[in-house]
Every structure is written in C-alpha cells, then in structure tokens.
Amino acid sequence: MSVPAELGYTKEHEWVAINEGIATVGITAFAAEALGDIVYVEPPEVGSTVTAGESCGEIESHKSVSELYSPVDGEVVDVNQAAVDDPELIGSDPYGRGWLFKVELAEEPADLLTPEQYTQLTEGEG
C-alpha cells in the first residue's frame, strides 16, 4: 500500500502535509481501505480550533462510523468541500483530491510518525 514519503502520519491513520505553517490533513489509504465505501464526512468547521489527538469530526462508511482526529493544534482555515460533497474522493484519492481540512498551525507537531514507522504500524494491523 502506498505511503507517500513526504507526509507525516498518526496512529489514528491521518496524514499531514505541512507547507508554510499550514497543515493539510486527510486519512491514509490504509484507513480508507479499512472503511470501505465512504458515504459521509463531517470535517471540523472553518474557524474552529482543533487539538492534536482529539476528535474533530467523523467519517462514515457502509461498515462503520469513525471519529476523525486532528493530528495538529491550530485553527481550521479550509475544508475540502469537494470531499464533503463526494466522499468517494477520500477513498479513490486519499493523498490528493480526498484531503479533508487545512489547519493554521499553532506550533509544529512533535509526535508524527515517519513513513517507515507508519508502514510498520499498518503491517502489524493488516
């Protein structure tokens, strides 16, 4: 399974891309595959404050409803309305068009997993 090298990861299966103080967040291909057909996503609202490791929304598939966790601290500055309107994007392109929300970082995240660490985690769960 694809684990892009330029991203950070969490144990809850979110990915983070940081560019000039803005973190783009999504769920990993591993999580998308485990969920199956994603039918609904409720990301945090623009302007809300999110805290690393805390629930900030939910994602629903035919199989289950799962909490969406923020991997970073900060203020939500954008939500991917295309993924809200068409949740299948999350499963079909989780690292591209299926991103979920963007956060203006309060501080650099300290405990993200490297791609290698995340691969080891998923091999243990897979």
From Swiss-Prot:
One Pfam family, short name: GCV_H
Keyword Ligase: no
Residue pairs linked by disulfide bridges in the UniProt entry: none
GO-annotated biological processes: glycine decarboxylation via glycine cleavage system
Keywords: Lipoyl
Domain Lipoyl-binding: 22-104
Cofactor note: Binds 1 lipoyl cofactor covalently.
Cofactor(s) this protein cannot do without: (R)-lipoate
Classification via HAMAP family: GcvH
Complexes and interactors: The glycine cleavage system is composed of four proteins: P, T, L and H.
Annotated NCBIfam families: gcvH, PRK01202.1
The protein's role, per its UniProt record: The glycine cleavage system catalyzes the degradation of glycine. The H protein shuttles the methylamine group of glycine from the P protein to the T protein.
Name of the protein: Glycine cleavage system H protein
Organism: Thermobifida fusca (strain YX)
Lineage: Bacteria, Bacillati, Actinomycetota, Actinomycetes, Streptosporangiales
